[in-house]
């Protein structure tokens, strides 16, 4: 049996979590993806498959303010922006989907900043 790569293991964890975590119009899903360089967050209504709000470190307006900061500080900034955009769209409560990543480091920093920004999960 071949050894599974870390990416394959993460995808398996994500599938396992997604069996139970569903976003609704009243309580959409806050989905996080983390790459080696960037972090992305989306607020998704799974009933219609639509993204209601999104933020990431690749956006030009965010990227300019994040130069010279650590990846954890960048994740905090993305968490604050996603909370602001979700609240502007009328979203107060979300279900957190960590995307198969450990709830530690950048993923935790993004979640804490989103909570501090007013989102409840």
Curated annotation (Swiss-Prot):
One Gene Ontology term, aspect cellular component: cytosolic large ribosomal subunit
Signal peptide: none
Gene Ontology molecular function terms on file: 5S rRNA binding; structural constituent of ribosome
Gene Ontology BP, a term: translation
Keyword ATP-binding tagged: no
Keywords recorded for this protein, A-Z: Ribonucleoprotein, Ribosomal protein, RNA-binding, rRNA-binding
PANTHER family in the cross-refs: 39S RIBOSOMAL PROTEIN L18, MITOCHONDRIAL, LARGE RIBOSOMAL SUBUNIT PROTEIN UL18M
Subunit text: Part of the 50S ribosomal subunit; part of the 5S rRNA/L5/L18/L25 subcomplex. Contacts the 5S and 23S rRNAs.
Protein task: This is one of the proteins that bind and probably mediate the attachment of the 5S RNA into the large ribosomal subunit, where it forms part of the central protuberance.
Similarity comment: Belongs to the universal ribosomal protein uL18 family.
Name recorded for this polypeptide: Large ribosomal subunit protein uL18
UniProt source species: Roseiflexus sp. (strain RS-1)
């Amino acid at each position: 049996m071949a050894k599974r790569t870390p990416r394959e293991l993460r995808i398996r964890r994500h599938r396992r979590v997604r069996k139970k975590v569903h976003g609704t119009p009243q309580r959409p899903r806050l989905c996080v993806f983390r790459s080696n360089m960037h972090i992305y967050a989306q607020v998704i209504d799974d009933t219609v498959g639509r993204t209601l709000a999104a933020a990431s470190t690749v956006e030009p307006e965010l990227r300019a303010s994040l130069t010279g900061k650590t990846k954890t500080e960048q994740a905090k900034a993305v968490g604050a922006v996603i909370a602001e955009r979700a609240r502007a769209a009328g979203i107060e409560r979300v279900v957190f989907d960590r995307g198969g990543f450990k709830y530690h480091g950048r993923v935790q920093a993004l979640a804490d900043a989103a909570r501090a920004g007013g989102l409840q999960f």
